[in-house]
Amino acid sequence: MMTDPKFIDVDGIRTRYFEKGSGEVLLLVHGSHFGTPDACESALDWEYNFDALAQSFRVIAMDKLGQGYTGNPKTDADFTMAATVKHAARLIETLGLKNVHVIGHSRGGYVVARLTLDHPELVRSCVIIDSGTLAPGPSKTEYIMKEAPKPRLSRESQRWCIEHYSFRPDHITQAWLDEAENIAKSTKYQETVRKMEDEGLKSKQFFTHLAVHKEETLNWIIQGKLTQPTLLIWGYNDPTAELKRGQMLFELIADANPNSEMHIINRAGHFCYREQPETFNQVIKGFVEKCAGSK
């Protein structure tokens, strides 16, 4: 169970995280972004993995900038992916960590990849999970999510969105929905929705900035700047970040980084780490132990 959350000040942002275990340090970074009308993700996304991984490692699961119970960006100019990456890096530094195995899902996968490029001195290895944000090619997310029931961000609508990201919706727990529903109702989160959706920061700034940032990130990968051991994990049945896009991303990484590999999890959608947690946890355990042994 993910209980006893901790809070720390990261450059003036009150940041929530969970911590358990000892040994090699794993930082778990969830997906989505601030102000999304689909589903409110948080550190609790890792509820199937946290305790299992903490049996072997020191595991830290964070709420990203403006998500979960972490504070919002301090200025409108910080409603960007670059600010999200910087916040995650500063959390590592504020906690006094180094040689961290960074593990990110979806938008969080983009965060850990870019963090590894920006701050290689902080990172021992990088794990990218079903990250349509980082992968080349168009996403199907907007097309699928436009059918979500209204009102958006209601408990029922969030369940629908998560189900349509998934191959096996039985991974959706009441505790997870409780968390998502409570976050959606918070004044803090409603402010991000207002800024991103109503005031147009999503289209005017977030996505335009992300397009430029992503192009730079992929170019750096092609140029061989991602040198840490890197693992891609992908759900074979992901309906939004399709496997073929994951394979395209792996080709870019593998051509430039010999210390890279990819693991495909069958009968799993976008939330492969929740839909097939035992398989996922074993893959992570093996990869981290191999990386730790090669120091």
Question: Residue ranges of each PLM-predicted region?
Answer:
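Conserved HGGG/HGGXW glycine-rich cap/lid loop of the alpha/beta-hydrolase fold
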Residues: I13-G71
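Acidic beta-to-alpha connecting loop that harbors the catalytic carboxylate
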Residues: S32, Y236-D238, R267-G269
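Active-site loop/oxyanion-hole signature of alpha/beta-hydrolase fold enzymes
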Residues: D45-D51, A61-I103, Q282
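Flexible "cap/lid" loop of the alpha/beta hydrolase fold
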Residues: A113-L117, R124-W160
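Helix-loop "lid/cap" segments that line or gate small-molecule binding pockets
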Residues: Q158-H171, E179-T187, F207-A211
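Conserved serine/cysteine hydrolase catalytic core
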Residues: Y189-E251, E261
